[in-house]
């Protein structure tokens, strides 16, 4: 839910500085999750609103603009996967956004003023996918790369060559780089999620995430199986095409055999833009692919050149984003469900309504405070939209439609799953069930234990966990390692092959390093990063279980609250018995690293940032070496940074380090220190 922003003109200088810094940090985090991890933390409309607020703040208070601000960079921060890096010949810019016709009219007025007269526009549908650059040499596809941070992307050539829509050879022997969008058609997305659910895997949240995750696979067979498609819409080298307009470029792309969207339209006045937007707002669900807006581009390429670009966006184009589609429905009931950590969450059960192409009947109400703020009662008529076209969310209650017999919700006092008394922990908004034997928590906890970022037991998703619990084959994480093929064959949809495959995955998970096991145990407030820091420090699960609050809290990056949660978890007889059973099943309980961290290392406890291209080592290798020597390797520079190691072509991070007075080393200084440390 969006915060209520104080009008900018009413902010004090100090308030503006604090809010700007907070939004800069928050949006970097959200951008990294969206662009790098393909796992958005917030819906698009929330990100867009926060970003627009930051732009407005930085325009009013330019003294608070920093090089690392999301407004100064395109896309994600430095990429971090195993895919090879590619430097783009020209920056891959993103588009500026507007969210209303008034804002679009303002953009048109500025553009017309800059050009001196009204120019024709080419209108295109905004495809909801992943930006890609395709390089052809003598008509042959030789390279494909993602946007990345706009300057450096990832090489996905092998993956892109599996996409049937993208030709490996053009109809003419041109040497040219073109850009476009890779997407997953709606039918492919529905089929993929149906198969994933049948396999007991988590379904993808939306086609965009599915496309991004599919394209960045290290196994090209997976990419090929996902039935991706693409549209091409841009080149920075129009002279190679012999065209003078954007609409002409699209026609030439098609002649070359490249896939293009044929819904573009050239218009001469703003009223036609509104008609085009209205047309595709109503027709978007009938398209075979997802769109989230309309792109308006100055059609004449020479005028595009005259208008130019900012550091982040072109001045000659703008994206109009569709508002979330809304529908009216009635709240029939409010149900309360229990999560992995015992948080009890209300969910609205509503009359089914068709929204953004799917039938929606449920929406999360988050917590009792949210319910009170929205004043939602059973029987109310409410507006419903999909936040980011993904997550159903109630907008507001239509009070004039409230029936006289509407029912005020009843906040439960006992757990809906196990009937234990619920508690309200000070400082938290959620109600919580603290019964360790709660059936709902057990199912959620087992699913978490098997998840990809924990023990990574492929094929053991929520459906399979539910079946195993119902059959009485498992009761806690230790019992997972006692499942047999014979037991699995009694469950729905299991055959010999799938049963053996799951048992193999369970056995493979026994060899995981300690940090995965720690994270998988589901200890409150212990995420993947905290689990790694703790595993590195204590090396064995036994040592962690015997550590004091002070011992754990002394780890750089682990606070007192997390330490208390860990000690409390391991203090129970049930947890102690669990460790014994895991050990007897052969589950590794040690940190698997060849290096014992030397607390006397120069890097121990220091926050280090790597930037630029390293010539003598890869970024992942340097990161691992630093972590093995006790450093906390961060992705951005702040006042808490102890050291920046700068390779070739270091950019904004180096500039910020200089501004803040942070110590900066060359790569050679780092290598010299490595030699010294390794020779101890």
Swiss-Prot record:
- Transmembrane regions: none
Q: Which domain of life is it from?
A: Bacteria
Signal peptide segment: none
Instruction: Tell me which Gene3D superfamilies the record gives.
Output: 5' to 3' exonuclease, C-terminal subdomain (1.10.150.20), 6.20.10.30, BRCT domain (3.40.50.10190), DNA ligase/mRNA capping enzyme (3.30.470.30), Helix hairpin bin (1.10.287.610), Nucleic acid-binding proteins (2.40.50.140)
Q: Where is the BRCT domain?
A: 598-680
Binding locations of NAD(+) = 44-48, 94-95, 124, 147, 181, 297, 321
**Catalytic function, reaction form:** NAD(+) + (deoxyribonucleotide)n-3'-hydroxyl + 5'-phospho-(deoxyribonucleotide)m = (deoxyribonucleotide)n+m + AMP + beta-nicotinamide D-nucleotide
Active-site residue list: 126
A Gene Ontology molecular function term for this protein is: metal ion binding
Main enzyme class = ligase
Q: Which cofactor does it need?
A: Mg(2+); Mn(2+)
PANTHER family under this entry? CHROMOSOME TRANSMISSION FIDELITY FACTOR 18 (PTHR23389), DNA LIGASE (PTHR23389:SF9)
**Name recorded for this polypeptide:** DNA ligase
**What is the originating organism of this protein?**
Leuconostoc mesenteroides subsp. mesenteroides (strain ATCC 8293 / DSM 20343 / BCRC 11652 / CCM 1803 / JCM 6124 / NCDO 523 / NBRC 100496 / NCIMB 8023 / NCTC 12954 / NRRL B-1118 / 37Y)
């Amino acid at each position: 839910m969006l915060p209520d922003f104080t009008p900018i003109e009413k902010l004090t200088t100090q308030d503006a500085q604090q809010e700007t810094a907070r939004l800069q940090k928050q949006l970097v985090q959200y951008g990294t999750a969206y662009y790098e991890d393909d796992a958005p933390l917030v819906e698009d409309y929330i990100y867009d609103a926060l970003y627009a607020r930051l732009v407005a703040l930085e325009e009013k208070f330019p003294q608070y603009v920093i090089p690392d601000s999301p407004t100064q960079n395109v896309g994600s921060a430095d990429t971090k996967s195993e895919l090879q890096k590619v430097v783009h010949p020209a920056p891959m810019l993103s588009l500026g956004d507007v969210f209303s016709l008034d804002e679009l009219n303002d953009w048109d007025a500025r553009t017309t003023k800059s050009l001196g007269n009204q120019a024709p526009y080419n209108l295109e549908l905004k495809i909801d996918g992943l930006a890609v650059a395709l390089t052809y040499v003598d008509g042959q596809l030789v390279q494909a790369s993602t946007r990345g941070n706009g300057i450096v992307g990832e090489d996905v050539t092998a993956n892109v060559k599996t996409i049937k829509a993208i030709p490996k050879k053009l109809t003419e022997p041109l040497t040219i780089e073109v850009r476009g969008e890779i997407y997953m058609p709606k039918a492919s997305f529905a089929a993929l999620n149906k198969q994933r659910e049948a396999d007991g895997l988590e379904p993808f949240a939306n086609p965009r995430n599915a496309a991004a995750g599919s394209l960045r696979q290290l196994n090209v067979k997976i990419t090929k199986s996902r039935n991706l498609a693409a549209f091409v819409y841009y080149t920075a080298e129009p002279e190679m095409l012999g065209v003078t307009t954007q609409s002409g470029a699209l026609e030439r792309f098609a002649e070359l055999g490249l896939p293009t969207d044929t819904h573009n339209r050239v218009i001469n006045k703003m009223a036609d833009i509104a008609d085009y937007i209205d047309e595709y707002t109503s027709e978007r669900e009938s398209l075979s692919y997802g769109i989230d807006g309309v792109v308006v581009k100055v059609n004449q390429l020479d005028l595009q050149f005259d208008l130019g670009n900012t550091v982040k966006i072109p001045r000659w184009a703008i994206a109009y984003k569709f508002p979330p589609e809304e529908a009216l429905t009635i709240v029939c009931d409010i149900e309360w469900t229990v999560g992995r950590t015992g948080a009890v969450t209300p969910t609205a059960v509503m009359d089914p309504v068709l929204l953004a192409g799917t039938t929606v009947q449920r929406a999360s109400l988050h917590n009792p405070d949210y319910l009170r703020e929205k004043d939602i009662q059973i029987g109310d008529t409410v507006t419903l939209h999909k936040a980011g076209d993904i997550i159903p969310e109630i907008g507001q209650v239509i009070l004039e439609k409230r029936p006289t017999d509407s029912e005020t919700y009843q906040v439960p006092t006992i757990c809906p799953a196990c009937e234990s008394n619920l508690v309200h922990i000070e400082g938290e908004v959620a109600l919580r069930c603290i019964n360790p034997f709660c059936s709902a928590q057990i199912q959620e906890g087992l699913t978490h234990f098997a998840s990809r970022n924990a023990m990574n037991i492929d094929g053991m998703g929520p459906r399979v966990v539910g079946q195993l619990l119902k059959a009485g084959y498992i009761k806690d994480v230790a019992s997972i390692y006692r499942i047999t093929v014979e037991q699995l064959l009694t469950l729905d949809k299991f055959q010999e092959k799938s049963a053996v495959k799951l048992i193999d995955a369970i056995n493979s998970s026994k060899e995981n390093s300690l940090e995965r096991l720690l994270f998988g145990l589901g200890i409150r407030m212990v995420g993947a990063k905290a689990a790694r820091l703790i595993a590195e420090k204590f090396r064995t699960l036994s040592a962690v279980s015997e550590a004091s609050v002070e011992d754990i809290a002394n780890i750089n990056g682990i606070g007192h609250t997390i330490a208390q949660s860990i000690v409390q978890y391991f203090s129970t007889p049930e947890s102690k018995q669990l460790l014994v059973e895991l050990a007897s099943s052969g589950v590794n309980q040690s940190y698997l690293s060849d290096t014992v961290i030397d607390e006397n290392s120069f890097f121990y406890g220091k926050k280090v940032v790597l930037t630029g291209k390293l010539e003598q080592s890869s970024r992942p290798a340097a990161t691992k070496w630093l972590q093995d020597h006790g450093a906390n390797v961060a992705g951005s520079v702040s006042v808490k940074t102890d050291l920046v190691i700068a390779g070739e072509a270091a950019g904004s991070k180096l500039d910020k380090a200089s501004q803040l007075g942070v110590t900066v080393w060359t790569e050679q200084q780092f290598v010299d220190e490595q030699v010294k440390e390794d020779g101890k």
